């Protein structure tokens, strides 16, 4: 049953470290990707796998041994069953919003050597209900990570603002905009920046900076700090990244692919 966020206690309940009872909460997308590949003889083969930026973040945290829960939109359909089973197999708590539109799908097709992604209507219609179970998870979480969220939806934006108490201590943002999923780029940027202004941590890639702000990554990084973000991680694929914060720390590392384990 969908609850009302204002009915929930506003008393902060987050603990300092994630535990099974108060895991890190990841909010965003969980979809199935169909990968089409060109065979040597010129034909196409396809395979599918569970994916989505929020699901991928969740899996990465689980592999590191971090207690984590996922909040995402899926359908009551075979793809939704597949996602549930995948998370259950890895012992990850899942608090879904079940969508009448179904579970989102992305189709990856080869184009000039690079994958070209298209998203179906269900992926574009992904929405989080912020029901009682989801809000309780968010309120108890030591950290709340956002990736692949529909920032261009005004209601989603407002519900997230209401749900995350003390964002300056807990909110971790990754816009991860995708062509074909962002329906209103102006609203997406405006609402994302509203969350950045009070976030603990914001991640931006060079692709994010170009797609959202039409600006170089360094410029967009400075803008995030000016908006109020406490920490910003700016990355350029395997070319490296830069961590800066409002206290004056500025650390840069080039060529991630050369890092030793």
Kindly give the residue locations of the regions a language model identified.
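Structural alpha-helical scaffold elements that stabilize or flank donor/cofactor-binding regions
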Residues: 136-137, 194-195, 225
